[in-house]
Amino acid sequence: MKKYLALALIAPLLISCSTTKKGDTYNEAWVKDTNGFDILMGQFAHNIENIWGFKEVVIAGPKDYVKYTDQYQTRSHINFDDGTITIETIAGTEPAAHLRRAIIKTLLMGDDPSSVDLYSDVDDITISKEPFLYGQVVDNTGQPIRWEGRASNFADYLLKNRLQSRNNGLRIIYSVTINMVPNHLDKRAHKYLGMVRQASRKYGVDESLILAIMQTESSFNPYAVSRSDALGLMQVVQHTAGKDVFRSQGKSGTPSRSFLFDPASNIDTGTAYLAMLNNVYLGGIDNPTSRRYAVITAYNGGAGSVLRVFSNDKIQAANIINTMTPGDVYQTLTTRHPSAESRRYLYKVNTAQKSYRRR
C-alpha cells in the first residue's frame, strides 16, 4: 500500500515492472488492481522522463533494482543480468556529494525489500551489517565491502578515477559505474540455497528447477517487481498463483506484498505453485520429462494455455501429450505456444536447469 500511495502522490506533484500473469484464473479484482498498477507505472515513467529527459527513464524491474532519492535527482541502478551498478545524479549543486551518499548506501544496503519503496524518493535505505552486495562487489584493492569506512574510501576512489558526465540536452548527468564480480549470479544464488532445499523437500520439487526458475524470473534479485505486479525472487502474483497456493493450504485471501518480498516465503510459495502445477493442473501427463516441460511453460503462462496448445479439451490434451515423446512435447511448446514469451521461457529455464544439475 505504501508504494501505491507514493505513486498516487507524486503524479499530480510532478505532472514504468514480467508482463505475464501466472495461472489462468482471471478475476475482476485482479484485473482492476493490475490495470490500476499499470496506469501508475506509466505515470511514474512519465514523471521520470520529465525530470531526467527523453530516453532517460529507468525503473525497477524483475532483474533491475532502481532506487531514486534527492527529489528524484539521484538514482542507483543495479542490473543483475549484466552485473553492473550505475549511480547517477542530475543534481545541479555538489553532484559528487550526492553520488557519494548513494554509492555508500547502495553498497551497504540490506536485503529486506519490504523496507524500501522503489517508487518514491524517500531515502529509506538502511546500512546493514550484512550488506546484500557483500561478496558481489570488491573495491579498488580487491576486497569485499562490509563496513562504512571501506565503502566510503571506495566511493572517494570512484569519484576521483571513474566519474563520468554526459549532456542529454536537458541535463548534465554525472555517473559512476561499478562492475560486479564475474560470479555474482552464483554469489546471490548461494544466499538462498538453504531456503531452496527446504522448499524442495517440503513439496517434492527438484532443487535445480527451483533455482532455474529463480534465475530466469529475477536473476536472484529479492527486490524484483514487474509491471504485472509479480513480486520477489520467483515473481509470484498475489491474486493468482499466490491465491491458489493459499487456498490449497487452507488459508483465505492472498499473500501480502511484504510476505512475498520475504525470500523464504516467496520461495516457499513459488515452489508450492510448481508442485500444484505438477501434481494437480498437469498431473494427467504421464511422462515426467514431458510434464516438466509443461510445468515450466505453465509457470510463465498458465496451465490452461499449455493444454490448449494440444487441444481445447483438457483431458484430450493430456492424452495427446501422452502419445508424444518428450522431445516432441518440447518442440511443440517452443514453437506453437501462442505466447512468444512462454516459448522463450521454456528454453531459458530448461537450459538453466541443466547447468544446476551439473553442479
From Swiss-Prot:
One of its GO terms (molecular function) is hydrolase activity, acting on glycosyl bonds. It is found in: Cell outer membrane. Keywords: Cell outer membrane, Cell wall biogenesis/degradation, Lipoprotein, Lyase, Membrane, Palmitate, Signal. It catalyses: Exolytic cleavage of the (1->4)-beta-glycosidic linkage between N-acetylmuramic acid (MurNAc) and N-acetylglucosamine (GlcNAc) residues in peptidoglycan, from either the reducing or the non-reducing ends of the peptidoglycan chains, with concomitant formation of a 1,6-anhydrobond in the MurNAc residue. A lipid is attached at C17 (S-diacylglycerol cysteine). Pfam families: Mltc_N (PF11873), SLT (PF01464). Belongs to the transglycosylase Slt family. This is Membrane-bound lytic murein transglycosylase C. It comes from Escherichia coli O8 (strain IAI1). The gene is mltC.
